[in-house]
Amino acid sequence: MSDPVFFPFAGPISLGEVAALAGAALPAGLDGTLAVAGAAPLESAGPDDLAYMDNAKYAEALGRTRARACLVSPRFAARVPEGTAALVTPQPYRGFAQVLARLFPSAARPGSLFGATGVSPGSFVHPEARLEPGVVVDPGVVIGPGAEIGSGTVLAAGAVVGPGTRIGRGCAIGPGASLLHALVGNRVIVHGGARIGQDGFGFAMGAGGHLKVPQVGRVIIQDDVEIGANTTIDRGASRDTIVGEGTKIDNLVQIAHNVVIGRHCVIVAQVGISGSTTLEDYVVLGGQVGVVGHLRIGMGAQIAGSSNINKDVPPGARWGGTPAKPVREWFREMTTLKRLAARERGPEDTDG
């Protein structure tokens, strides 16, 4: 549940405004000035709350909800109970997100831990750093010489911005994050503990020992990227590591040197991408996917969680497994193995 201690409430919102934000249609005869004062799941929503539903698994909960209004896709609209206004929209979840951002704006991105404005006297900002008006700098932040920070950007406690690093406007850098050797666009969110721009893992290996290869590239992060907590993005070896516009990266992801990630990709937790691999636009990697280096994953490809990629993936493909292959082929192999195992199982095979 939302707790006003953590997420201050911005005030009630009328159903008319909800519909406008969510791209939904108000039912005929519904008073659009009626308001909701919160948001909650179907099963716990009360008469002042907004809920949403776009998954058949929750059809039963929809039929019992007590919410004042529910954002719902057309296929489920008839199941909304009396007493709950059905706000029909093709994308209920997306609409719900937009309403939540209006009700609880501080939850949309990391902010100052002190609710502060301006530059805290407990921070260290090098005299040669350049900060535009409206930058918020918490205590414990370190900003190196030649760094540039755009207006409206918030640096939470303990964040580190290295020499020469540039961060655009309207960004949010979470507590304890570090950004070195990086060029960051506008409206970028970096969650706490993320590490951007450290050494790539490069060694010239040999019998006489492993010689470290200096990493002299940068990290370039384009507009509207979000990077999860404790994710690490290595700077390039001799070219840049790039994260494209609108890409969303979960927590605990490792992105190696020289990786190029296209626009609007989604990378789920615990993914590891080896060096010099390219993801084209709109690629989705499920949790714990491992990608070998020097590969190309084509535009719009989707990789199932826990898969391992050891060769190029064509555009639009859906792959899974270890090693990964087209999903239909993977499913056929799994079904065949299951049949063979069942046929060969003896009476002593009783575990599980």
From Swiss-Prot:
It catalyses: a UDP-3-O-[(3R)-3-hydroxyacyl]-alpha-D-glucosamine + a (3R)-hydroxyacyl-[ACP] = a UDP-2-N,3-O-bis[(3R)-3-hydroxyacyl]-alpha-D-glucosamine + holo-[ACP] + H(+). GO terms for molecular function: N-acyltransferase activity. GO terms for cellular component: membrane. Its EC number is 2.3.1.191. The keyword Lipid biosynthesis applies. One of its GO terms (biological process) is lipid A biosynthetic process. It holds the Pfam family LpxD. Keywords: Acyltransferase, Lipid A biosynthesis, Lipid biosynthesis, Lipid metabolism, Repeat, Transferase. Catalyzes the N-acylation of UDP-3-O-acylglucosamine using 3-hydroxyacyl-ACP as the acyl donor. Is involved in the biosynthesis of lipid A, a phosphorylated glycolipid that anchors the lipopolysaccharide to the outer membrane of the cell. Belongs to the transferase hexapeptide repeat family. LpxD subfamily. HAMAP family: LpxD. PANTHER family: UDP-3-O-ACYLGLUCOSAMINE N-ACYLTRANSFERASE (PTHR43378), UDP-3-O-ACYLGLUCOSAMINE N-ACYLTRANSFERASE 1, MITOCHONDRIAL-RELATED (PTHR43378:SF2). This is UDP-3-O-acylglucosamine N-acyltransferase. It comes from Methylobacterium sp. (strain 4-46). The gene is lpxD.
